[in-house]
Every structure is written in structure tokens, then in C-alpha cells.
Amino acid sequence: MITMSRIRSLAAFAVFVILGVAAVLPAQAEVRIDITRGQMKPLPIAIPDFAGASAQDNRMGADIARVVSADLERSGLFKPIDPKAFIQNAASLQAGPRFPDWKAINAEALVSGKIESGADGRVRVEFRLWDVFNEAYMTGWTLSASPQDWRRLSHKVADAIYKRVTGEDGYFDTQIVYIAESGPKNDRKKRLSIMDQDGENHRFLTDGSELVLTPRFSPSAREITYLSYFKGVPRVYIFNLDTGRRESLGNFPGMTFAPRFSPDGNKVVFSMAENGNTEIYEMNLLTRQKRQLTMNPAIDTAPSYSPDGQQIVFESDRGGGQQIYTMSADGSNPQRISFGDGRYGTPVWSPRGDLIAFTKQKGGQFFIGVMRTDGSGERLLAEGFLVEGPTWAPNGRVLSFFRESPSDERGRGQVVRLYTIDLTGVNERVLLTPVDGSDPAWSPLIP
């Protein structure tokens, strides 16, 4: 589990140093994945155990290779080769790859690595990425951290490989906050929970004594805003992951819900229901001043900022049905952008700024989809009896959401699980949690 002190200690990570390799072969058409071209064949990659000087280092080296391999495999872009097929062992690999051995097992990329425990108690990890076809070095880094943070080291290695091969930022050194659900349908316990993006290092942040919903990360990944029914009163709160303390966004006259941070982290946009009307408001966290952004006799909710903070996308029934609208960040110039059949809700702007994810309900089914920011190019990626809560990975190439299966008249058989899916709509994966899970929110890359 990642403790607060360990999270802070990661600020002392050694600066990533590109390994000096003098004998680099001349540049050729190297291994590359163009993830903008849709569905493609995964890249065969060999990831042997990272070699160590001691038995303890060797065990950690094997664990690091396992996590790197799992990260890359889940992306759907890489196909790690079974280690049983390896001809060259990890120890001899440190002297350099025997490329014919790796070509013989059809590897197109190769990762070599080593790990060393230092006198200061920290571990030092080196890795190199090789283009097997061209017999060329591609990149390499050196990283160090405390031994208990070996999983973060692994995720950072996977991020570096992903970026070098695809040209896009990775998303493995991240966390997901979500609502852990347990108990019968008529007495559901919901707890605010957090874990690494692969489901590891899981912990509960609240005890389930009060209902919690819709958690969202701050841009720093150190705070979470969410809705809590504390003492039966629905209010928006901000939870600090470093201190474990929480504070109310404000003591407002109506029910507040659906909060989300601005890209600079200085504001929270949210909905407030008062006197039978639901409007969108913005709270400046520095001045504690609140301003109303929508003024319409309709339900305006689920606001989400554009990455530059200049626009907000939201859902509204002002046109007679649940649809998606955009407006300027000051509330001006509202425009409807969804015009397909069905009802649209829970819009979320991509971190890249190019797409908006949403939930759609049509013909008794729910869908997770994406559209361009003007509403064009709608694509449906996932469907089910109930699928909701899309949230973007920080690179804007993967989504997480939750899917609920139907229950019988006694509430039996209901299962609520988290999933991830990429923009091709093909690579859908279950994200395992200790109990049922809903309302996921993906963090930015962890500082």
C-alpha cells in the first residue's frame, strides 16, 4: 500500500537519465505503433526478468518484469512473449542482446534491465529498450526509489516503453478512485476507495457509515472531491490524500452534487438543486466565492471542464430531453451538441481536448461512447444493461467505466464492476476490485 509519507518520498525520485550507449546502430525504420490508426496487431515484446546482484534483487527484478509486462499487455498494443520461449537468459543479456536468439522467437522489441540495492537503502533500476529487427538500441533510463515503491518504478518503466514506441504519453503510473459497494441492494454500503490503475495497492478511504458518490481527482492527484450524505445531508466535500482530512465545499441552501475540479485546481464546478431547480455553479477555492453559471428552468448537471479551462460540457433537459451541451466557462454561449437518438448524460472532456465521452441510453440499453467536441463523429464503445461513469486516462486514449448486471426481484445476482476500454472499442478489460465498484475516476500521472 502506498502510504502518504512514501508518496511524498517519491518526489525525491532520481531524475531520469538517458543511458549512454555509444555503439548505437544507424537510424532505420524502427519499431513503432501508430495508435491513431484504430485496431492493430499487438507488438510482440520480450521482457525478461531484471537481473540483480543478490537473491533479493533477483526476486524484485522478476516482480518488476511481471508488472511491466502486465501493464503493456493490458494496453492491447503489446503482446509479451512467454518467458519459457526465451533463449538468452537475463544475466547474459546484461552484456548485450544476442539478436538472432530474439528473432528466433519472433520478438520485435526487447527490454533488458537490472536492479541493484544501494547502501542508502534505495533500489536503483536500469532498463534498455531494443529494436530486435534493426538490432538497435531505442532508449533507456535509470530510476531509483525506496524498495516499497518498486511497483511505481515498474509503472514508470512501462510508461517509458509505451511512449517510446507509440509517441504518446503512458498512463500506468496512475491511480483510480472509485466507490466500493457491498451488501444487499436495499442496504448497500458505499465507501470511497483508491487503488493503482492495475487494481493493486487498494485501500478504503471512508468506512461506509455515510453514502458517498461521484469522486473526482484534482489536477495534482492529491485531492478528491465527491458527494457525501454526511448525517443525511448531501454535500460536496474535498478529501486530502496526504493528510486524510476533508472539508465541505460550502454550506449551501440546496443539495450540492456532481463536483469536478478545474484544470488549474483552483475551482470546483458542481450542481446545486434548490426550490425544484438544478443549476451549475463554480466555487473559487482561493476566494471561496461562488458564482452561478446556468440560469434555466431545467436540470443542468454533470459539468466537466475542457483541458484549457475555457469551456464546460454538461447535460441538460432544457430542450425537453436529456442531452449534452457546451458553454463558455463563464456560462455564456450554451450550445447543444448531441442530436442522435436516445438520451445523453455524464459528459467528460478528454485530457487531449479532442473528444467528449458520454453515457447514452437507447432502446432499453446503456452505452459508453465518444464524440468530437462539436457533437460529430459519435462512436459507441461499450454497451450493457447499465453502463455509466466514463472517465479518461490522462493520455486520452483509454476510458474506465462501470457496468452493472441485472438482479432478480429479490435483488440477487447484481454485480457492479469496473472496466477499461480503448478508443477502438475492442480492448475491453475487467478491472478487479475487492468488492463491487462504481463511479471510477482516473488520476493524472502521479507527480
From Swiss-Prot:
Keywords: Cell cycle, Cell division, Periplasm, Signal
Pfam families: PD40 (PF07676), TolB_N (PF04052)
Gene Ontology biological process: cell division; protein import
InterPro entries: 6-blade_b-propeller_TolB-like (IPR011042), PD40 (IPR011659), Tol-Pal_TolB (IPR014167), TolB_N (IPR007195)
Record's subcellular location: Periplasm
GO cellular component, one term: periplasmic space
Stored Gene3D superfamilies: TolB, C-terminal domain, TolB, N-terminal domain
Residues spanning the signal sequence: 1-29
Family of this protein: Belongs to the TolB family.
Function: Part of the Tol-Pal system, which plays a role in outer membrane invagination during cell division and is important for maintaining outer membrane integrity.
Known partners and oligomeric status: The Tol-Pal system is composed of five core proteins: the inner membrane proteins TolA, TolQ and TolR, the periplasmic protein TolB and the outer membrane protein Pal. They form a network linking the inner and outer membranes and the peptidoglycan layer.
Protein name: Tol-Pal system protein TolB
Organismal lineage: Bacteria, Pseudomonadati, Pseudomonadota, Alphaproteobacteria, Rhodospirillales
Gene name as annotated: tolB
